[in-house]
């Protein structure tokens, strides 16, 4: 984890599947806020139950080692197609970890979205 993000993570954090084939890293505090939001959803909805089940079954608590590294579980590495080079970036309330290849594929989509949103 780049040094600029280590202090905000503190000692422990949670890794989970993110959108678009990346891994999200949450502080314990932000993970707790997400859990509280999920509790407000209608648990009687099968799609919501399935989403929550998948999210929690593939989430993993982790601790930074003395060099600021985390062990990424095999299921998350496989999901994010991470095998070599990474891109790590801050994204508001979380850190995103991407396969460099997948991250670069999204560049053209990003430019198109900026134009679509008038930015």
Regions flagged by a language model, labelled:
Residues 72:
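Active-site beta-strand/loop microenvironment that shapes enzyme catalytic pockets
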């Amino acid at each position: 984890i780049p040094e600029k993000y280590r202090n905000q993570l503190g000692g422990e954090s949670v890794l989970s599947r993110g959108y678009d084939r990346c891994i999200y890293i949450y502080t314990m505090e932000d993970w707790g806020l997400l859990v509280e939001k999920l509790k407000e959803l209608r648990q009687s909805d099968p799609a919501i139950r399935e989403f929550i089940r998948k999210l929690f079954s593939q989430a993993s608590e982790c601790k930074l080692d003395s060099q600021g590294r985390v062990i990424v579980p095999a299921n998350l590495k496989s999901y994010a197609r991470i095998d070599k080079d990474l891109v790590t970036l801050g994204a508001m309330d979380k850190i995103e970890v991407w396969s460099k290849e997948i991250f670069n594929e999204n560049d053209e989509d990003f430019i198109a979205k900026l134009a679509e949103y008038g930015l």
